[in-house]
Amino acid sequence: MDNEGNNPTLSFVNGNSMIEHQTLVHGIFELCARIRDQKPLVHVVTNFVVMNQTANALLALGASPTMSWAQEDAAYMSKISDALCINMGTPVKGRIEVMKTLMTLAARMDKPVVLDPVGSGAGAYRTGIAKALFALAPRKIIRGNASEVCSLTGTNYTTRGIDNTLDLEHARQILAGHGRTHGDGEETGTDEPGWPSILVSASSLIVSGQKDMILAPGRRMILDNGTPLMNSVTGTGCILSALTAAFYAVTDNGFDAAVAASAVAAIAGELAAEKASGPGTFMPHFMDALYNMNEKNLAARLKVESTAS
């Protein structure tokens, strides 16, 4: 899908000033409308645990999912898809090889990629896979919890399974201390202007948690939305990664895609929590909230902290 010249310029951060709230909301909903209109085909290779709800969430948003992980499908699916989402949960050897093939093809075809490094930092095996995948595609968004994202910086940071063991501020400090670069990738040292050098190899980072932090070169936005119920069901983070790929399929701006997906998913969670009686009824209401997402709900609920990175 060619989006050149057809992208809203949301300009989430202008120097140190926040974008006007309604302009931000309108820009996010414009991307929602574009997904519903264009129905981008999102190729998702995800873990066995969340395949069904991930596909349903994409459909609810308005995108079209394909969930193939056959090596024989890789070339064709790469050609026809509009975005790729790689989730490295259940990292069986054959699946990892398919992921590498798909990311290589996406790079060759300049397709947008979202990488979810599930469990990175929890042992050498997963961390090694995550770093190998991270190196493959240049046009990508990384989406994970603070522990997973920080494990990609090369620091000796370990996690407990797939659980997050870092708070947002600690993660920000780790990322800020992971070298800082100018746009040419030249190291500046941590005391000079620049941004975390991990962003030289990724258009944006989504660090998910109680609050979501989105980073791009020169930009940082923190969203204070969501509900604790999202931690009581499996797959909400994996779903966010797939939704991010859908947004990235309809805009060339990775930061816009990351912010829009994070906002929509978190607000859908809030709406679902108000109707659900517990985890068992949360997910159906979450799907309904994605399907019925509108600009009014976004405007009423979006809570943003935004600063220059």
UniProtKB/Swiss-Prot annotation:
Pathway stated in the Swiss-Prot or TrEMBL entry: Cofactor biosynthesis; thiamine diphosphate biosynthesis; 4-methyl-5-(2-phosphoethyl)-thiazole from 5-(2-hydroxyethyl)-4-methylthiazole: step 1/1
EC number: 2.7.1.50
Alphabetic keyword roster: ATP-binding, Kinase, Magnesium, Metal-binding, Nucleotide-binding, Thiamine biosynthesis, Transferase
SUPFAM superfamilies for this protein: Ribokinase-like (SSF53613)
Pfam families: HK (PF02110)
Cofactors named for this entry: Mg(2+)
Binding site for substrate: M67, G235
Sample GO molecular function, one term: magnesium ion binding
Residues that span the membrane, as ranges: none
Gene Ontology BP terms: thiamine biosynthetic process; thiamine diphosphate biosynthetic process
Source domain of life: Bacteria
Residues the entry annotates as binding ATP: R143, S208
Protein name: Hydroxyethylthiazole kinase
Species whose genome carries this gene: Desulforapulum autotrophicum (strain ATCC 43914 / DSM 3382 / VKM B-1955 / HRM2) (Desulfobacterium autotrophicum)
